């Protein structure tokens, strides 16, 4: 049965598909597919026996509603980095549920991403002001991996060859400790978990991680310890609670070199563990080592301020195995939400929330003492931890009253607890404190007493208070009313380009439809309000959802098992390589440490390999863009005794189905290695071929590409891995679940990673069904080949498969334009903005080219509109080649053209205003204006500004 959803997911209608096939010389889609996908990997049919039949959105939502109802939403006061938070309705409606925000891509084309970049600059400013550190990035994946990145930075900048010890506060969050263990071992880093008072330093210590407040809730002044660490040449990272940080002096004042944490409690629901925006702030000295994206200010060609991604040369897509991190996707959408939460509340509002939580904590402590429950006299923020013989009874009474408390020690059943912890959050109030005290009173057999009045003094005496003005920037004060904030959000939207405006043809990025029905369940409280460490029997709906997804994805990829834990494609790569490494070690092959990687590979591949403790050896590609099989055989033979893995992307990064993929896998296996397949291009394979069936041992999938989770302007993403049966025992574990002895440690803070967005992919697969998924892949291939055909006479297609066809994307060669007219790939990218399009992927995997991926969701009219735009641009280049247009002062070199420039009283350019801004007739009805003119990136990197201007700076500028 054809899925009723299919016609909504596909851009081209059946009639348009037939037209496209005829253009390419085919009558039937099946005949076309047989020409594109090699015979030895093409499946006769998709896995109908495992995947559900397709259905409409109402049926799928009803089915998912039944699953969601299995989740029991209790009041979780567990804490440990996850807290209840109230997302302002304005932000939920105008940001979280707004496709103009969630369908955009990473802001590489900054001139059409100024709105998102401003929201991210607000986020960086928020973090910088909270921490007192001048450089903050635009988000990381979660707090645990941010701490691991801090360990990596500290290790990387240390120049003492003997230094390999990293000291970790014994009060660090348990999931952070677990992820640190995973990260440290492959790099040869020795971890020592110790009470800060007992920390001893020698020349082997390169770094320290402190938690403030600690997992036990305690606050203390780390100044003396940090001075001792610095005297020993070690960097100090402090993991902070951003809400607590509103009350006391910035951690930079105590001497911290790096601050990390999670912005989850700034308006982002717990979501059973994610996604949430982590943050990373550091000193100016480490600006070129900071991981992740960094937004900075520069100027455009007209001299106006403009924002863009700064210092990109340190990132994995350029530095590869020498990169500071393998991070690619981060958590932009969640960082944007957190930034608007801060704009919504302002510094006074944030502080008021924090002070209220301290008051509730003091009130609860006082109530416990009236019940003769001993509470240590100490400064805390929002958390109380208690050791008592009544702990099992307290947990039972709290559960009966609808509360989940932290079970102490971590990881034991509540019936065996020796203590409990309570962390108050934004939903807490005095009534909740009273209910908790009633539960404790029942547990300890004391009469129920009236809760003490709210504490008047909320000072945190062990730490100096925050007294300097902070968040003085106008953005955090100007939008107090909902009307003003709504207009501000919309003003930023108008400065961006997303899928609501038109096709985003980025190669290797799969910017396909993110259907509203797929995203709707993410806001359901059954998914949004669960704590990741809640009792497992309260998350049966999530387990059902995960089981379905794991089973469906395994069937589609041909693997035996799937882990959904990795919360980005880069994390999937890393996890997959660790699984391979663990398998080799289980066989006594500890010496296998060589990872073969084609020279065309995405930069995350070598960066991930290095993080996994492997050494990268490059494999050449031939003139057709395929892996040079002779060179592969030579490298495999040369390193046969040490070969751990080959990392290969399929279809290749050059946009073709290589015919020798089975043979490539056989060569690697014959020499003792495993095959890691990068699933970035899986959108060309779903329902047509299965990596596990043609020789891959591991494959990561990008749910934010192939399976419809939106890109969010640069995250969130999900990067699960599928593995063959012999590798299944080594899939990532987690300390809060039953972790097997063979499992590698966790790669993400939560067991299910970014759990709350998994319903998106579940909905997509449920509505599509097996046959529709195969059809979608086929149409993705058809659309790419249609564009390749239309554009080939104007921009040669650089690589084609054995039958002359491309896969789901194609590379257009622009290098002759540079030679003949002085027009480079950036000129084309910027000129496309004037035509209303985001540029394709620029200068990757081949410099001077663009890589185009249309996906199956774009209509024939949109494909033609894009082709017409590129052909018109080619005509403009010809005018330069013939001398009809000036070589320097032309629409390409001056692109993009802003409304201000076009409407200026003086127009001194040798081409018309219409040619500048309305080069195609249909643009008079649908015009997207770049917010700024071409940005000077070099100027911005030389004059790095990564926070909003202060009131004083704004006043001076005015």
UniProtKB/Swiss-Prot annotation:
GO MF annotations in UniProt: glycine binding; glycine dehydrogenase (decarboxylating) activity; pyridoxal phosphate binding
EC number: 1.4.4.2
Keywords: Oxidoreductase, Pyridoxal phosphate
Keyword Oxidoreductase on entry: yes
Gene3D superfamilies: Aspartate Aminotransferase, domain 1, Type I PLP-dependent aspartate aminotransferase-like (Major domain)
UniProt-listed SUPFAM superfamilies: PLP-dependent transferases
Any Gene Ontology biological process: glycine decarboxylation via glycine cleavage system
Cofactor: pyridoxal 5'-phosphate
Positions bearing N6-(pyridoxal phosphate)lysine: 705
Entries under InterPro entries matching the protein: GcvP, GDC-P_C, GDC-P_N, GDC_P, PyrdxlP-dep_Trfase, PyrdxlP-dep_Trfase_major, PyrdxlP-dep_Trfase_small
Pfam families from the UniProt entry: GcvP2_C, GDC-P
TM helices/strands, residue ranges: none
GO CC aspect terms: cytosol; glycine cleavage complex
Enzyme class: oxidoreductase
Catalytic activity: N(6)-[(R)-lipoyl]-L-lysyl-[glycine-cleavage complex H protein] + glycine + H(+) = N(6)-[(R)-S(8)-aminomethyldihydrolipoyl]-L-lysyl-[glycine-cleavage complex H protein] + CO2
Matches recorded under HAMAP family: GcvP
Task of the protein: The glycine cleavage system catalyzes the degradation of glycine. The P protein binds the alpha-amino group of glycine through its pyridoxal phosphate cofactor; CO(2) is released and the remaining methylamine moiety is then transferred to the lipoamide cofactor of the H protein.
Annotated family: Belongs to the GcvP family.
Assembly information from the UniProt record: The glycine cleavage system is composed of four proteins: P, T, L and H.
Name the record gives this protein: Glycine dehydrogenase (decarboxylating)
Organism (species): Synechococcus sp. (strain CC9902)
């Amino acid at each position: 049965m054809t899925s009723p959803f299919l016609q909504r997911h596909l851009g081209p209608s059946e009639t348009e598909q037939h037209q496209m096939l005829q253009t390419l010389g085919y009558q039937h889609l099946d005949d076309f597919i047989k020409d594109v996908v090699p015979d030895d990997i093409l499946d006769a049919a998709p896995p109908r026996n495992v995947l559900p039949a397709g259905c409409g959105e109402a049926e799928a939502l009803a089915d998912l509603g039944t699953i969601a109802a299995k989740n029991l939403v209790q009041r979780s006061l567990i804490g440990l980095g996850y807290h209840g938070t109230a997302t302002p309705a304005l932000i939920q409606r105008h940001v979280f549920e707004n496709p103009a925000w969630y369908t955009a891509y990473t802001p590489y084309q900054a001139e059409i991403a100024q709105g998102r970049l401003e929201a991210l600059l607000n986020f960086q400013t928020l973090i910088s002001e909270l921490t007192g550190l001048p450089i903050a990035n635009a988000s990381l994946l979660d707090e645990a991996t941010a701490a691991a990145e801090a360990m990596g930075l500290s290790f990387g900048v240390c120049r003492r060859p003997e230094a390999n010890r990293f000291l970790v506060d014994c009060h660090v969050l348990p999931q952070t400790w677990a992820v640190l263990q995973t990260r440290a071992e492959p790099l040869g880093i020795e971890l020592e978990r110790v009470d800060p008072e007992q920390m001893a330093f020698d020349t082997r210590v390169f770094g320290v991680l402190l938690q403030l407040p600690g997992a036990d809730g305690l606050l203390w002044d780390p100044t003396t310890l940090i001075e001792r660490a610095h005297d020993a040449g070690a960097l100090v990272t402090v993991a902070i609670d951003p809400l607590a940080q509103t009350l006391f002096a910035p951690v930079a004042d105590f001497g911290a070199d790096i601050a990390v944490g999670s912005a989850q409690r700034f308006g982002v629901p717990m979501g059973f563990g994610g996604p949430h925006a982590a943050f990373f702030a550091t000193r100016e000295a480490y600006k070129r080592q900071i991981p992740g994206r960094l937004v900075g200010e520069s100027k455009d060609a007209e001299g106006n301020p403009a924002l863009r991604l700064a210092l990109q040369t340190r990132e994995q897509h350029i530095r590869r195995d020498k990169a500071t991190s393998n991070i690619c996707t981060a958590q932009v959408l969640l960082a944007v939400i957190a930034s608007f939460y801060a704009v919504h509340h302002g510094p006074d509002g944030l502080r008021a929330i924090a002070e209220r939580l301290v008051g509730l904590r003091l009130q609860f402590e006082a109530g416990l003492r009236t019940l003769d429950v001993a509470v240590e006299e100490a400064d805390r923020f929002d958390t109380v931890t208690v050791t008592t013989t009544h702990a099992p009874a307290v947990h039972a009474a709290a559960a009966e009253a609808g509360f989940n408390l932290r079970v102490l020690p971590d990881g034991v059943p509540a019936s065996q607890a020796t203590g409990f912890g309570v962390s108050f959050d934004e939903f807490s109030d005095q009534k909740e404190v009273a209910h908790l005290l009633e539960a404790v009173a029942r547990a300890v057999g004391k009469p129920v007493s009236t809760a003490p009045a709210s504490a008047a003094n909320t000072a945190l005496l062990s730490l100096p208070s925050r007294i300097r003005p902070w968040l003085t920037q106008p953005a955090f004060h100007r939008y107090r009313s909902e009307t003003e904030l709504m207009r501000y959000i919309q003003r930023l939207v108008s400065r961006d380009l997303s899928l609501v405006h038109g096709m985003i043809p980025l190669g290797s990025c799969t910017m396909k439809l993110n259907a509203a029905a797929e995203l709707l369940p993410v806001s359901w409280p059954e998914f949004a309000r669960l704590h990741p460490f809640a009792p497992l029997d309260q998350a049966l709906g999530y387990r059902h959802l995960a089981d379905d997804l794991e089973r469906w994805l395994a069937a589609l990829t041909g693997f035996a098992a799937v882990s959904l834990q990795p919360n980005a494609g880069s994390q999937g790569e890393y996890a997959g390589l660790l699984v391979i490494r663990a398998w080799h070690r289980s066989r006594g092959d500890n010496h296998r440490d060589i990872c073969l990687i084609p020279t065309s590979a995405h930069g995350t591949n070598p960066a991930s390999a290095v993080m996994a403790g492997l050494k990268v050896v490059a494999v050449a590609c031939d003139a057709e863009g395929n892996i040079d099989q002779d060179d592969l055989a030579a490298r495999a033979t040369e390193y046969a005794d040490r070969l751990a893995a080959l990392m290969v992307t399929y279809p290749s990064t050059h946009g073709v189905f290589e015919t020798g993929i089975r043979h490539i896998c056989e060569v690697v296996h014959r020499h003792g290695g495993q095959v890691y397949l990068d699933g970035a291009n899986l959108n060309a394979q779903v329902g047509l071929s299965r990596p596990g069936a043609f020789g891959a041992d591991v494959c990561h999938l990008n749910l934010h590409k192939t399976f419809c989770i939106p890109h969010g302007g640069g995250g969130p993403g999900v990067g699960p891995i599928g593995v063959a049966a012999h590798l299944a025992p080594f899939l990532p574990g987690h300390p809060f679940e039953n972790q097997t002895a063979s499992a590698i440690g966790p790669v993400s803070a939560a067991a299910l990673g970014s759990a709350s967005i998994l319903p998106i992919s579940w909905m997509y697969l449920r509505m599509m069904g097996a046959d529709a998924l195969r059809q979608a892949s086929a149409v993705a291939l058809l659309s790419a080949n249609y564009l390749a055909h239309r554009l080939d006479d104007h921009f040669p297609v650089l690589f084609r498969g054995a039958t002359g066809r491309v896969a789901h994307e194609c590379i257009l060669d622009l290098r002759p334009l540079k030679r003949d007219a002085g027009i480079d790939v950036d000129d084309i990218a910027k000129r496309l903005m004037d035509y209303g399009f985001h540029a394709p992927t620029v200068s990757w995997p081949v410099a001077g080219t663009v890589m185009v991926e249309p996906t199956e969701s774009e209509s024939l009219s949109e494909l033609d509109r894009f082709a017409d735009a590129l052909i018109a641009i080619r005509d403009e280049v010809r005018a330069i080649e013939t001398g009809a247009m000036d070589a320097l002062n032309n629409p390409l070199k001056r692109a993009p053209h802003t409304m201000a420039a076009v409407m200026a009283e003086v127009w001194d350019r040798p081409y018309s205003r219409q040619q500048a801004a309305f080069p195609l007739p249909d643009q008079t009805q649908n015009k997207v204006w770049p917010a700024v003119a071409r940005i000077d990136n070099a100027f911005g990197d030389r004059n790095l500004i990564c926070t909003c201007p202060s009131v004083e700076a704004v006043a001076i500028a005015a």
